[in-house]
Amino acid sequence: ANGVWRARISFFDHDVPCETQWGRWFASYTAFQTHYAALAEAEGCGLFLTGCEMTMTEHRETEWRALIAAVRQQYHGPVSYNCDKYGEDHVNWWDAVDCIASSGYYPLKDWENQLDRIEAVSKKYKKPVLFSEAGCMNITGSSAVPNNWELKGTRNDLEQADWYSAMFSACAKRPWVMGFGVWDWP
């Protein structure tokens, strides 16, 4: 609760005395995730995400694979991980999950280009894609920077509606897109 975005979680790649180490962090995070995986199993949840936008941890492939395996011991439904926008082709362990999940905060005029890029990842891993976060604020200019939660300006419901229309239209033509989780923008 220090206000730092989880994408900034990072440690030295080699153990350094007096510094938090990846092994200890992943052990703690795995315990956290397996606790919630057991709850998700008990409640009959339809999908379990092992993390979201943890960009600086994604290169720790061995640890992520072990965490996903531990989650699968507790939760028997589909499992994934949600990468940040533009990060779909940076995760090397999509084969360990059931779908490729991403934060779909792409500019209104760039959806087709981004879907072309993401399609290559979907084909490589033979996995559908879920935009488990997607959305755009109702502020003038937000369709160009839909992930900017600090954007200030004039209310513009039409710009927000145009962004959603573009996203849904572009994705409707791509059978490998399995769905969306719409972020709670105003």
What are these regions (language model features)?
Residues 1-57, 185-186:
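Substrate-binding cleft and catalytic face of glycoside hydrolase catalytic domains
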Residues 16-20, 139-161:
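A solvent-exposed, charged loop/short amphipathic helix patch at secondary-structure junctions
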Residues 26-30, 55-62, 86-90, 107-112:
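Acidic-and-aromatic substrate-binding clefts and catalytic sites of carbohydrate-active enzymes
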Residues 29, 33, 64, 111-114, ...:
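Aromatic/hydrophobic pocket-lining residues that form the small-molecule binding cavity
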Residues 31-32, 42-47, 57-82:
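Active-site neighborhood of glycoside hydrolase catalytic domains
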Residues 34, 38, 69, 73, ...:
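Solvent-exposed, polar/charged alpha-helical surfaces in well-ordered, non-transmembrane soluble domains
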Residues 63-66, 148-150, 179-186:
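C-terminal/domain-terminus segments
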Residues 73, 78-80, 84-149, 165-181:
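Glycoside hydrolase catalytic-domain groove-lining segments
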